[in-house]
Structures are given as structure tokens and as C-alpha cells.
Amino acid sequence: MPGKIENGTPKDLKTGNDFVSAAKSLLDRAFKSHHSYYGLCSTSCQVYDTAWVAMIPKTRDNVKQWLFPECFHYLLKTQAADGSWGSLPTTQTAGILDTASAVLALLCHAQEPLQILDVSPDEMGLRIEHGVTSLKRQLAVWNDVEDTNHIGVEFIIPALLSMLEKELDVPSFEFPCRSILERMHGEKLGHFDLEQVYGKPSSLLHSLEAFLGKLDFDRLSHHLYHGSMMASPSSTAAYLIGATKWDDEAEDYLRHVMRNGAGHGNGGISGTFPTTHFECSWIIATLLKVGFTLKQIDGDGLRGLSTILLEALRDENGVIGFAPRTADVDDTAKALLALSLVNQPVSPDIMIKVFEGKDHFTTFGSERDPSLTSNLHVLLSLLKQSNLSQYHPQILKTTLFTCRWWWGSDHCVKDKWNLSHLYPTMLLVEAFTEVLHLIDGGELSSLFDESFKCKIGLSIFQAVLRIILTQDNDGSWRGYREQTCYAILALVQARHVCFFTHMVDRLQSCVDRGFSWLKSCSFHSQDLTWTSKTAYEVGFVAEAYKLAALQSASLEVPAATIGHSVTSAVPSSDLEKYMRLVRKTALFSPLDEWGLMASIIESSFFVPLLQAQRVEIYPRDNIKVDEDKYLSIIPFTWVGCNNRSRTFASNRWLYDMMYLSLLGYQTDEYMEAVAGPVFGDVSLLHQTIDKVIDNTMGNLARANGTVHSGNGHQHESPNIGQVEDTLTRFTNSVLNHKDVLNSSSSDQDTLRREFRTFMHAHITQIEDNSRFSKQASSDAFSSPEQSYFQWVNSTGGSHVACAYSFAFSNCLMSANLLQGKDAFPSGTQKYLISSVMRHATNMCRMYNDFGSIARDNAERNVNSIHFPEFTLCNGTSQNLDERKERLLKIATYEQGYLDRALEALERQSRDDAGDRAGSKDMRKLKIVKLFCDVTDLYDQLYVIKDLSSSMK
């Protein structure tokens, strides 16, 4: 087995010693904070749980009182000026949960003030009114309900709203996504039999507040463990509210949380308590994984926390959760990793037996959706096993799952246990760096083929590059302390990887600036990044991340060698030459050298993937065309524009668009070199195109495109049959693409129309070229059947692949971003996107023609400048320079209208979405603009150099 990845040595011995002392202090304080009965917890206070604890009444000697009046006062102190509680920029759902629960608590206290006499009814009424107004405002713009990470939201929010409606004596709260919430509620409830909750432990026990009045809480007392319902203060509070028999153990638990939690008696209640196993494993693993050595931080604290984990795994039969009796794969895997780092390894076999699924590991026994970070934690724990080969199947499974997740993630990778995309990004960089290290050393080389290694390398490269590209000027990432730590830890790990040799100075600069910001950052600034029912911070864990980031950033790093076995990371000579060409374009001339080189390297990972599909549709080697050098260029056009605009579209979308670009070039060549000559009679080729498209639409079973129908061509030659098969393969690859079939019927219809027009335009172009080639003069097209305006808006424009590619992209957005809904739903949006498509297509044709004048003249192909509108002006013949100047002016005119159409589309999309305009509305516009940027880049490149293969 190859040696471990060395962290390096401190640049400054005194600074290093300071961090070591701080790390040992953290370990000691965490261990000493551990209570032998109630455990350990440094999670921040949460309004949601505080509100539920504030609603617990208790009757003593026939006198009813609020059990925790300090919680009520905490709610008064934390209400914002706009009437809300818990508003966060990263999640709307948490604010709705906090505000709804706090308003409910105030309503309960307003109806029965009991012993709390220092708040007037007028003040209470005003606070409740402001709270309800805020809640309605939040519900009206709620757009992350389907994407929410928060536990039990499908149960909790409907229950809260129902309780509020009853207390306020008002009809139902109406808001745009209510039907979505109700559907989610029904689907989730369908997975549970409430009667079974009385027997076996169930995840519902974590959210009993959603089942007040629906369950007999007196039958749930046996589920209490050390006074809590699954370590949830809000669920435990609901149990005390709903049970007819008082439970002293539950009261004692909540009193301990009140006194010893993050609120320290001020009324604030932690959202989860305890988090013993979570904190022990995260603190140890975070400190030892990349920053500190075991020798540096060994002591009573480290040994004590390690012992807690060992005993928990022993007592709970090999699988643990964040707290006792809450088993999950996350905490189990992290504990295994932590213990391996302190040289006390525990077998992962039971974890595998309990949590391994068909294609990934589940966090719990059942869950609505899988977790990327859970699988990365499993992978990291397995990579530390001494008998690595025994776990090859699971390593392969989790690596493949992670690659697929990254491949399909649009903009930022997302996970349900952490609100920041930087957390799963950091874990991916850590895990895949380790995977590459083991591949280089031969330990895992047999597991992954070249394509798989390519995707592993691509994932790391993109993860790190996007972290670099999104760093703020002050050195932080959005001003968040813990998230900045995640970013630094990922970048520090990347310094070991050879892919980043060309940009090591930039990478180190990012680390240094992050280090400086982090050192000056106050420990009191909270970063509520972890998710449960709402969002919270874990104090000791946040401190561990800060120390690990500071320590690792201060270490000298040996030469980067990891990843040397991934040859696709080395750009080809064609790409190197291409960079000089791209430098001349208006889009990329302002870019720093490192940024351009980074996109070139990222592009190189896509080239082998494209090469593997190079002849999947069209035969190449016997066609009389030049070598397809554009294959190595295509990936950059998409990657470069994607990085330049910081759009970060998914690899799934990027690759499909790259492949479509490749097919666009190949179709152009194939129709000219093969299909046209084979058919001879172009009317027959027109009929064949219609037949192929109609058959593809009517019969999805023809997806492999290898069997052609004999109808209509009873005596056709084998070559005609082969052409029909080839065109069927192409048509299937576009119209029967998996995501196209999952898109809206309207977007599919648009694609079919544009695709049919594109294919027929090729044949019409062949006819035009044939007539043009028979002319005595090649200077002007003497027999056009349309004016130039008509031609460029029909055959000329449709002949380039822009319009149908645009429609294809809209189908991908419909399927993947919008759950099969129309990409552009209103009639106005549909018109405007068609306008964008048309102007982009016309520009593409004009600039393409501008760049290919010499080739078109040589091959006698019709070019824009051959039309009479360019050859003559006021009866005077125009020379070549004059024609080119006029063509550029018209192209500039089209550019202006494209820009205006894009602006109008953006305004209309915002107006149609109203207050609920959310991330998906913005994303689709970003992707449309990215498509237009790529079109613009091709246009600029055509002006500099003709990119098409020449016909021999």
C-alpha cells in the first residue's frame, strides 16, 4: 500500500506550536464537557426548539404554570424588526419553521399568560400580528420547498400551519407552493404506519410535534432514552405537552439542555441534544486528517474522546448515530475514520451490512433521497482500511455514486446535511485525492477504467477551480467562517495533486488570503451551516475546522505528484495551440493566463470522453474529409465560457452540448460527403429525412438505429440503406435522448421542428451548392431562390446547428432543472426565447460565413457574401473587403437584437415568476446566456480562423 499523504512541515515553528496547543485545548475541553449521562453537545440555540419548550405547561398543586418561562423571554428577545425569527440567506424553510413555531408559542402565552405578567396584552398582540404578517410574506415567496434539506419538513410545516389556523381562527394559509407541500406530506406519510410507532423505534419519534392529537403519547414513554425523544428537545417538549401523565425524566433532560446547552440558561434551546458521537468523531477526524499529527495532539482529551467512540461502537453493535440510539451511516463512518487515525481501527463490516444499498449507502434504513456526504464519509473510512482489497466493491460503488452526483449537479453540489456546497466539495477533494493516490500506487488501479479515472480527475479539478474562482476579495468565502475553513482544507489537499502545477501560485495565494482572513475572524461570528429541522452550528466542531484550516495552511507542501496516472490531465498540443487562438477573442483576451490555462486543462478531461463516442453515430475513417481537429477544441468552447461566466452548469449538460456540437460538425460533413452523393436525387433524401424522423417519433423501440424500414425504397442500394441507418442513429440520439424524453411535450415539439428544419436545410444547401458550382463564375450566386434576408432566416440559418441545439438545451433544462415543466412557460417567454434562438442562429451563420470565405470559394459552397445584396451596391460591384464589412455590420445588428431579446426574456421571466422567482428561474437564464456566450465564442473564432474540416 502506498504511503499516506504527508501533510508537510510548519513554515513557522512558533505559529505551529500555537495551533497545536489550541488543538489540545479543544480536545481537553470537549472531553471535560462530556456528561456521563446526558453526553456532549455544543450545538447553537435554535428558535424552533426554544418555541416548543416555551409551550410546555405544568400543573403543581393545582396551579398551572409555564415550565420554562425563560424560553418565552428568549423568543421576545430574538424577534426581528420585521416580525420574523431565524431568517437565513441560505434557506427560506428554516425561517418559516422558526417564525411559525415562535408565533404559535406567543399565541399560547397570549391566551394563557399564567405566571408571566411583565408583558402587556397590547405588546403580545402587536408581536403576534407582526409575526403572522412576516410568516405570510415568507410563505408567499417560498420557493425551496422541494429542495429543502430540513428533517421532517413535510410533516412539521403542515402541522404548524394547521395549529396556527386553529389558534388564529382563520381559514387556511394560502401560498403558491401549498399544493406541492401537501403532495410531499402525502407521499411521506404513505411510507409510515403510525400504529407501528408504538412498538419499534421510528424516525417519526424525532418529530412528535407534528403528530400532536394524532398519536397517543402515553404509549410512547418507552421510547425515551435518558429523558429525550431521539435527542430532539422539540420532540421531547411535544411529548410532555401531549402525554396525560407527567414524565420527570423528560423534564430533567430539558432542564439539563437549558442549563448546559449553548444558551447556558438564557432561555435558548439547542436544536439537537446531545450530539456526542458526532462531535467526538468530527473533532478527531478534522484535526488529524490534514493538519495535525497524532504525536502532536495526543493526550487525555484525544484519548477520552476516542474511548467514547470505541465504547459506543461496542455498546451499539458496530453502528452509531450522532447520539445514542440514532444509528446512521454518517456518524458510523466518521467514527471509523477517526479511530483509524488514532491507530485504533474498527472493522467496517457491520456498517456495510446495515447501510449498503444497491448503488449507494443509505444514511438511515429508509430516506427520501440519498446523501452525497454520507457516501463520501463511507469512502473516506474505507480508504483507511489496511485490507483495502476486501472493500474494493464498496470503494467502487461509493466512488461511482460520487462521480455521478458531481456529473449531474447544476451550479453547486448540494447535500441534505449541510447548507454549504463547500462541505461536500471539501469531502470530495479529500476522498478523490486519496483515491488517485491509491490508483497511482497500484492499490486501486484495477478498479477503474480510463473513462472512470478521467471523471475522478475532472471532479477534483472542477471542485478546486470553482473554489478558487468564487473566493471573495477579502479572502473569505461569502464571509462565513466555517465555510471558509472547508474551502481552505480543500485547497490545501489540492496542493498534492499534479493537475494544479500550472496554477500552483494562484492556489497558494488563495490559501494565504483565506488564512489571513480566518486568523482575524472572531469566534463569535456564527455560521449556521448544519441542518436538522432548521439550521445550526456546532461550536467545538467549528473550532476544530478553524484550527485544522489554519494549521494545514501554514504547512510547507512537498512537490505535487498525485494523479500522475491520469494522462488526460495533460493538454494536447492542439489544445496548447488553440489557447493562443482563444487569447485573441474579445471574450477571453481579458482573462489571466492561469484562468485560461485552467479551463484548457479542465477541457482536456472531456476530450477522451468525446473521442470514445467519436464514431458512435457517423463512420469517419472512409469519409473524404480532413482530420477532425475540432474534437479537441469543442470541450473548451463550453468549459471556458462556463468558467468565465461562473455559471457552473452541470457536466451532464456540458457534455451533452459538447457531443451535440461534435455531431453538428459531423452531420455537416456527412451530408456533403456521403448522403448527398449517395442519393443523387435530393427529393428522395428529403423523403428519407421525413421518414426517419416520423419513424423515430412513432417508435421508440428503434432507439439503436440499426434496422431500417424497407417502405418506400424497395430496390434501394445498400449504400442508401446504410445512410438511412446512420441518419436514424443520429435522429435517435437527439430526439430519443433520455432527458429529451423526460422534458415537457412543448419543448420536445420545438426540438422536433427545429431538428427537422435543420436536416432539410442541409439538403437544400446541397441543392444551392450544386447550382452554384455549375455557374461559370464563383464570385456571385446568380440564381438564389430567396432574398438574403429570407435565406439567412430559413435555410442559411437553419443549416448551422445553433437552433436545434438551443432547443435541445431547453429540453435538458426542462427535464433536469424544472421536473419536466416547460423551460419557458408563458406565451411571451416562448416567443422571446424563439427570438433569442433566431438571432443567435443568424449571427452564427454570418460569422461562420465570414470565416470560411476562402474554403467556400474553393469548394464552391454558397456563402453569405455570394448573394446579390453583397455583390452589388447601387449597380457597382463590391470587392471582397467591402462585402465582408457589410456582413459584419449585419452580424453586429443581429447581436444587438439578440442582447435586447435576452434582456426582455429576463424581465419577462421575473415578471411571470413574481415574488416567487427563485434559483431555478435564474438558473435557466444563466444557462441560456452561457449558450449564447458559446455561440459568440464560435462567432469570434470564425472571424479569426475557419474551424470546420475541409472536404478533400
Swiss-Prot record:
Its EC number is 4.2.3.19, 5.5.1.13. The keyword Magnesium applies. A motif (DEXXE motif) lies at residues 668-672. Gene3D superfamilies: 1.50.10.160, 1.50.10.20. One of its GO terms (biological process) is gibberellin biosynthetic process. Pathway: Plant hormone biosynthesis; gibberellin biosynthesis. Signal peptide: none annotated. One of its GO terms (molecular function) is ent-kaurene synthase activity. Mg(2+) 3 binds at residues 848-849, 852, 856. Keywords: Isomerase, Lyase, Magnesium, Metal-binding. Mg(2+) 2 binds at residues 668, 672. Mg(2+) 1 binds at residues 668, 672. It comes from the Eukaryota. Its cofactor is Mg(2+). InterPro entries: Ent-kaurene_synthase_fun (IPR017057), Terpene_synthase-like (IPR050148), Terpenoid_cyclase/PrenylTrfase (IPR008930). It catalyses: ent-copalyl diphosphate = ent-kaur-16-ene + diphosphate; (2E,6E,10E)-geranylgeranyl diphosphate = ent-copalyl diphosphate. The Asp-Asp-Xaa-Xaa-Asp/Glu (DDXXD/E) motif is important for the catalytic activity, presumably through binding to Mg(2+). PANTHER family: (E,E)-GERANYLLINALOOL SYNTHASE, ENT-COPALYL DIPHOSPHATE SYNTHASE, CHLOROPLASTIC. Belongs to the terpene synthase family. Catalyzes the conversion of geranylgeranyl diphosphate to the gibberellin precursor ent-kaurene diphosphate in a two step process. This is Ent-kaur-16-ene synthase.
